[in-house]
């Protein structure tokens, strides 16, 4: 493609975004530049926001919140009146989190917190009476070993998990529901892979709306291979003689997965029934979602997937009889099926040919080619579309049964944006709740009865929050204005952000976000850093407020002044099923091609220093960086790989097989997607850096170790290769100051790359105060 054609293309920018070769002036008029401390270490220049725990009371709009002094209050967001229910001096010591009972009579406190995996943690739990303020332990002999606890909707009982067994508490009486829980058997909480890849949370139990029944999953890890993570320091100042070893049942590609069973507990007599979900072979079954589709306890929906997640079946359980039926099926063998966790009950309806007594729920599906809202009957039959078009619904945010409305967020204006709408499941009328002709990224939180909502403008400008009633269009009041931040930012000269679409040779258009350095001049030459994530269904290019983070820092530091390009390659999200599914069975191939193509187009711009174009990614982005270097394209001069996957055989089965299928059916695909060709690593002018935490339970350090061995064994020289491990750090790399060190190292490598062949050193001493932690 000729530069003139590229220029014409880049004019087709998302609305109000400036063309990249004619950048807007910085939004702030000051002269200060962002520093390392302000962007990486401190959050002083971050927008503030409020989030509330809505509660169902006689008056819709009540919520619970915690004051800065620690006291717990109930406040009406409508009247602004508040009531203290637990004063600060009565808060339990070492409190981590709290949940008020639905009847407002007690508070459940989690204390003595210990992190486990991404979502899960261990804690002690206490119940505090709101009237007397007396606090009693949930279990007398607890030692920071309770995994999860949850109030019933009626507020008179608690289900909790300890030692991988399910227990109940009711009026001070604790009852063991299961007794065979242990290292290989999980009741009511997910094992590692279900927490990380399927449920995305730390619980696997669900009370019925009337508190009569409790559905819960049981995971059996017998036969699942074990991966051992070593902790060399184990939070001690001096290393113990032997590392602590954590054995995790971690199924990798084509290895044995945990089996899963659905159980229903009758809370009145503590009897448990196991409900067979036999729509797939037990060794192949994945339970992706469990949701009550009733106002009482009559029906339960279970979304089941096959092992490689390209077939799904929604099973309806009739709880009185224990009978099951398949209500809906989906074939996604043209790619994969995402587990969107979006089943939402709406109630009994008489629509079309549906049974008048049938219950309905809404769910998201992309069977039309785009993810949209559909109305499903629990009796089966064809779903009824509520939305349609070449755009996608991204989330269901509330169901208003009284007004018969579904509230949702979608990309109707542009895939990088989110706007709020309602649709009637009676008349099918769609109503925007925001001006959907203006570029914006909105999020929302509805009250318990959906009569009020907090609307958050999340970008592209400085965020703010307003309170609305569904009965009027004007806001009731502003909750968060971030006026102080706006005033503070006027002291700064900020990097300039714009958005545009880049057409690739195959005809698809890629979303690109560009950040130009402070004081940008088209008469100068600037180094460029590409910052992809690029994973299936992911999105990095959005019109959210872009945090003043490391990328903003390297665009502000006068000794760095990097342009950054973030390119959402083929396979990323919110562009339709066809765009997503292009990468099926061949991860890393098209994604790398797209990043290379974008870099070559950037290199043609007059103000780009084409000899210094770097790429940096974390996790999937680190893997993609490796695949880009492997192409040996010459488009990039430096590669920075943080916590990368290097071979999909080394990653977990449920994520990898969703996109790559099994080894037996796609052996060649696994061979080509692994990072094994080393010429590109030998030839990249500025070399490359690999960073990884040794305590990473997600993307194991094994990936970096194996990649390093491949590179060394194939003759990559020390001048090209730098490797940095972070002792005991997990995937976020934060242990013992690791995060700050990581970003310092990245900044130094970028400085070295910018000045490659100049043999200069970054003069950190000029701004020594900038490195104070």
Swiss-Prot record:
UniProt keyword list: Aminopeptidase, Glycoprotein, Hydrolase, Protease, Secreted, Serine protease, Signal
What is the annotated localization of this protein? Secreted
Q: What is its main location?
A: secreted
Instruction: Please provide, in alphabetical order, the Gene Ontology terms of the cellular component aspect for this entry.
Output: extracellular region; plasma membrane
Q: Which residues are reported to be glycosylated?
A: 37, 80, 112, 220, 471, 496, 671
Which reaction is recorded as catalysed by this protein? Answer: Release of an N-terminal dipeptide, Xaa-Yaa-|-Zaa-, from a polypeptide, preferentially when Yaa is Pro, provided Zaa is neither Pro nor hydroxyproline
MF terms from GO for this chain are: aminopeptidase activity; dipeptidyl-peptidase activity; serine-type peptidase activity
Q: Which Pfam families match?
A: DPPIV_N, Peptidase_S9
Q: Which residues form the signal peptide?
A: 1-18
Q: Which residues form a coiled coil?
A: none
Q: Which GO terms describe its biological process?
A: proteolysis
Catalytic residues as annotated in Swiss-Prot or TrEMBL: 619, 696, 731
UniProt-listed InterPro entries: AB_hydrolase_fold (IPR029058), Peptidase_S9_cat (IPR001375), Peptidase_S9B_N (IPR002469), Serine_Prot_S9B/DPPIV (IPR050278)
Enzyme Commission number, as recorded:
3.4.14.5
What this protein is reported to do is described as: Extracellular dipeptidyl-peptidase which removes N-terminal dipeptides sequentially from polypeptides having unsubstituted N-termini provided that the penultimate residue is proline.
Family that this chain belongs to: Belongs to the peptidase S9B family.
Specify the protein name: Probable dipeptidyl peptidase 4
- Organism of origin is Emericella nidulans (strain FGSC A4 / ATCC 38163 / CBS 112.46 / NRRL 194 / M139) (Aspergillus nidulans)
């Amino acid at each position: 493609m000729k530069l003139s054609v590229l220029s014409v293309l880049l004019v087709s920018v998302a609305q109000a975004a400036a063309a990249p070769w004619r950048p807007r002036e910085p939004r702030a008029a000051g002269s200060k530049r962002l520093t390392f401390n302000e962007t990486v270490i401190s959050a002083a220049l971050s927008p503030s926001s409020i989030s509330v725990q809505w509660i169902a009371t006689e008056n819709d709009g009540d919520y619970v919140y915690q004051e800065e002094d620690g006291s717990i209050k109930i406040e009406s967001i409508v009247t602004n009146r508040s009531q203290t229910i637990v004063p600060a001096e009565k808060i339990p010591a070492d409190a981590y989190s709290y949940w008020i009972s639905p009847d407002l009579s007690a508070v459940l406190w989690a204390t003595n917190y210990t992190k486990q995996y991404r979502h899960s943690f261990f804690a002690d739990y206490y119940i505090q009476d709101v009237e007397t303020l007396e606090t009693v332990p949930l279990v007398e002999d607890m030692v920071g070993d309770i995994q999860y606890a949850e109030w019933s909707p009626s507020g008179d009982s608690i289900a909790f998990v300890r030692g991988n067994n399910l227990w109940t508490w009711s009026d001070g009486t604790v009852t063991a529901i299961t007794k065979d829980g242990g290292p290989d058997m999980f009741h009511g909480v997910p094992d590692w892979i279900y927490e990380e890849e399927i449920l995305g949370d730390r619980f696997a139990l669900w009370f019925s709306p009337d508190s009569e029944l409790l559905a819960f999953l049981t995971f059996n890890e017998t036969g699942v291979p074990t991966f051992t993570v070593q902790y060399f320091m184990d939070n001690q100042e001096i290393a113990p003689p032997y590392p602590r070893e954590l054995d995790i049942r971690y199924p990798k590609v084509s290895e044995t997965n945990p089996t899963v069973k659905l159980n229903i507990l009758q809370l009145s007599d503590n009897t448990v029934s196991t409900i067979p979900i036999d729509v797939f072979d037990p060794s192949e079954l994945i339970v992706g979602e469990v949701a009550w589709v009733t106002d009482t306890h009559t029906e339960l929906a279970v979304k089941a997937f096959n092992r490689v997640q390209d077939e799904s079946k929604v099973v309806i359980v009739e709880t009185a009889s224990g009978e099951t039926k398949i209500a809906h099926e989906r074939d996604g063998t043209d790619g994969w099926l995402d587990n969107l966790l979006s089943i939402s009950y709406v109630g009994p309806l008489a629509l079309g040919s549906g049974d008048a007594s049938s219950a309905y729920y809404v769910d998201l599906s992309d069977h039309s080619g785009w993810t949209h809202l559909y109305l499903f009957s629990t009796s089966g039959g064809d779903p009824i579309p509520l939305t349609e078009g070449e755009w996608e619904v991204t989330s269901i945010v509330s169901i208003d049964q009284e007004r018969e409305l579904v509230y949702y967020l979608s990309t109707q204006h542009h895939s990088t944006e989110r706007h709020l709408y309602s649709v009637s499941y009676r008349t099918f009328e769609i109503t925007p709740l925001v001006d959907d002709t203006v570029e914006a990224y909105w999020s929302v939180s509805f009250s318990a009865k959906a009569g009020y909502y907090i609307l958050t403008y999340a970008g592209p400008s400085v965020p703010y929050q307003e309170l609305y009633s569904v009965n009027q269009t004007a806001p009731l009041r502003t909750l968060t204005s971030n006026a102080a931040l706006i005033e503070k930012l006027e002291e700064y000269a900020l990097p300039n952000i714009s958005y545009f679409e880049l057409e690739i040779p195959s005809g698809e258009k890629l979303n690109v976000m560009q950040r130009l350095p402070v004081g940008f001049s088209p008469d100068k030459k600037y180094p460029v850093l590409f910052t992809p994530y690029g994973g299936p269904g992911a999105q990095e290019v959005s019109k959210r407020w872009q945090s003043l983070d490391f990328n903003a820092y390297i665009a502000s530091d006068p000794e760095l002044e990097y342009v950054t390009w973030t390119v959402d390659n083929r396979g990323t999200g919110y562009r339709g099923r066809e765009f997503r599914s292009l990468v099926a069975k061949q991860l890393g191939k098209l994604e790398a091609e797209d990043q290379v193509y974008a870099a070559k187009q950037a290199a043609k711009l007059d103000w780009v220093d084409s000899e210094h174009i770097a790429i940096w990614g974390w996790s999937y982005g680190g893997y993609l960086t490796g695949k880009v270097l492997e192409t040996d394209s010459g488009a990039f001069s430096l590669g920075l790989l943080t916590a990368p996957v290097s071979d999909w055989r080394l990653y977990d089965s449920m994520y990898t097989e969703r996109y790559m299928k099994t080894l037996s059916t796609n052996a060649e695909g696994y061979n080509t997607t692994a990072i094994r060709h080393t010429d590109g690593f030998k030839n990249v002018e500025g070399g490359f850096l690999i960073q990884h935490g040794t305590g990473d339970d997600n993307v194991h350090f094994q990936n970096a170790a194996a990649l390093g061995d491949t590179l060394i064994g194939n003759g990559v020289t020390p001048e090209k290769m730098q490797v940095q491990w972070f002792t005991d750090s997990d995937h976020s790399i934060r242990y013992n100051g690791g995060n700050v060190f990581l970003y310092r190292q990245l900044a130094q490598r970028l400085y070295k790359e910018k000045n490659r062949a100049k043999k200069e050193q970054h003069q950190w001493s000029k701004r020594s105060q900038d490195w104070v932690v």
